[in-house]
Amino acid sequence: MKILGIGNAIVDVICKVKEQFISQNNLSKGNMKLIFNENEFQKLLANLKIEKTVSGGSVANSIVGLSQLKNEVGFIGKISDDDLGNKYEEGLRKENVDFFYTKKKENIPTGTCLILVTPDSERTMCTYLGIAGKISENDV
């Protein structure tokens, strides 16, 4: 392996929404909101229809791009032993990324970014770091 990235392992959850959803939830269209409260995040998610999930996070996205350019790459991140964590791991493996991770059965879910796409294709993001935000030197 020639290139290794360390970052937040975040599953991008893509959902189509109407403009009304953005305003009703006090979101700022086209921006990203960091959500610290899991209940607030789950409340948003409960009202959405998931179109697609993708392994994401800025470092992982860069590593995937480098893999697609035929580089030998790896990524270090932290996921939970849950459905989204499994999807995250599978997504990176499909992109030929060696994934070095700490996978824990904890009450903290895998990090997730809701990507809310309005009819004009504008993206508004709501990110809950979950366990990704708990990565430490012990995980590396």
Roles of regions detected by a PLM:
Residues K78-S80:
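Alpha-helical transmembrane segments within multi-pass membrane transporters and channels
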Residues G91-I108:
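A glycine-rich helix N-cap at a beta->alpha junction
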Residues M1-I76:
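Glycine-rich phosphate/adenosyl-contacting loop at the front of the ribokinase-like
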Residues V54-N61, L84, E106-P109, A132-D139:
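Short secondary-structure boundary/capping elements
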Residues I14-K18, Y88, Y128:
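Short acidic, glycine/serine/threonine-rich loops at helix termini
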Residues F100-K105, I115-V140:
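Conserved phosphate-binding/catalytic loop of the ribokinase/pfkB sugar-kinase fold
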